[in-house]
Amino acid sequence: MADYLTVTHLTKYLKLKFDRDPYLERVYLTGQVSNFRKRPTHQYFSLKDESAVIQATMWAGVYKKLGFDLEEGMKINVIGRVQLYEPSGSYSIVIEKAEPDGIGALALQFEQLKKKLTAEGYFEQKHKQPLPQFVSKIGVITSPSGAVIRDIITTVSRRFPGVEILLFPTKVQGDGAAQEVVANIRRANQREDLDLLIVGRGGGSIEDLWAFNEEIVVQAIFESQLPVISSVGHETDTTLADFVADRRAATPTAAAELATPITKTDLMSWIVERQNRSYQACLRRIKQRQEWVDKLSQSVIFRQPERLYDAYLQKIDRLSMTLMNTMKDRLSSAKENKVQLDHALANSQLQTKIERYQDRVATAKRLLMANMARQYDSQLARFEKAQDALLSLDVSRIIARGYAMIEKNQALVASVSQITKGDQLTIKMRDGQLDVEVKDVKNENI
């Protein structure tokens, strides 16, 4: 009689076959994403073609490293291992790596992020800041060793000598590049002496330029209070930094030209033109005034000038007489008031009171002067005492009394415990110094 297997035994046997089959340990598979619903952690969906479907699992760590978002109906190429799930007897593929079919992962990530940021309004024209016409200092965020900074310096120096360039040395590709770009954009915005920023690098592959497609870089440029000119890659290269920047330049030279829209030559020509226009306007004004003066000089009043001031002379005479009479009246009134005041003072004995107060003031003055003299003598004595104390601490005066000062390695020696045999010492005396070598050390208290 034949032995019958249980479902469990058969399933375990098949699972063992799946697990040990080398062809199923690493499977290269292409298919269309189906039944995809994005989850917070692991992703579960199906891969299908025209004739078949297989369940797929992608762990959270793998999905996080994809660099693009899976979408329903997207065709992808995956690498993974096939496994059997015993409870249901179904098999699935555990995906270890995936990329879009027919388009690079970075290109897809670029399009997805561009779509997202466009929907959020990052690239709208209303957020663009105007570039200043005149600048005194330009910040440049790029590699210190590339051709970008050299081209910018050369172009700015040619167009408007005197404009300063402040370089923020920055890693522009590879791990950590995006973080450096963001940090330097924020550093530049903390300064008060910059007029605008140029952010850029030379050409390269999409991988080389990828730092300027990172969302954190787009966010930093969008939040910049300084106007930003983007100059990333060659003319045919386009990054998300170009879309969010206030202006995009195809080359570093073009970026420098945008930063200095008016050259020094343009400015000087404008000044000369304004000077000429002002000069011509002044000449016309002078000519008009001269014609007016000539016309006025031919009038009747200027041919008989005495008629111009006769009336004023008469008015002056009248005012003079009025003033003299007024002064006489006021002087007479003042004399009468003085007589009355003199009489009142004599009757009130005010003079006696004034003299008494003058005596009291004189006495107070003498006391004050005496007190000030005592204070001065006391302060002078304290000063002289302090001066003597300070002079007693003067090293040069101590040495002059016959003492010497010993130094070791230019440091003052205060005890024999600081000295060992063979040390080189300097002995300073009032009329010179000795350089000596210690032959022996003895400890003795004075």
Swiss-Prot record:
Pfam family, one: Exonuc_VII_L
GO cellular component: cytoplasm; exodeoxyribonuclease VII complex
Biological process (GO), any one: DNA catabolic process
Keyword rRNA-binding among UniProt keywords: no
Domain of life: Bacteria
Disulfide cysteine pairs (residue numbers): none
Localization in the cell: Cytoplasm
Protein keywords: Cytoplasm, Exonuclease, Hydrolase, Nuclease
EC id: 3.1.11.6
Main localization of the protein described in the UniProt heading: cytoplasm
Gene Ontology MF terms: exodeoxyribonuclease VII activity; nucleic acid binding
Catalysed reactions listed for this entry: Exonucleolytic cleavage in either 5'- to 3'- or 3'- to 5'-direction to yield nucleoside 5'-phosphates
CDD domains assigned: ExoVII_LU_OBF
Assigned protein family: Belongs to the XseA family.
Protein purpose: Bidirectionally degrades single-stranded DNA into large acid-insoluble oligonucleotides, which are then degraded further into small acid-soluble oligonucleotides.
Assembly with partners or alone: Heterooligomer composed of large and small subunits.
Alphabetized PANTHER family for the sequence: EXODEOXYRIBONUCLEASE 7 LARGE SUBUNIT (PTHR30008:SF0)
Protein name per the record: Exodeoxyribonuclease 7 large subunit
Upper classification of the organism: Bacteria, Bacillati, Bacillota, Bacilli, Lactobacillales
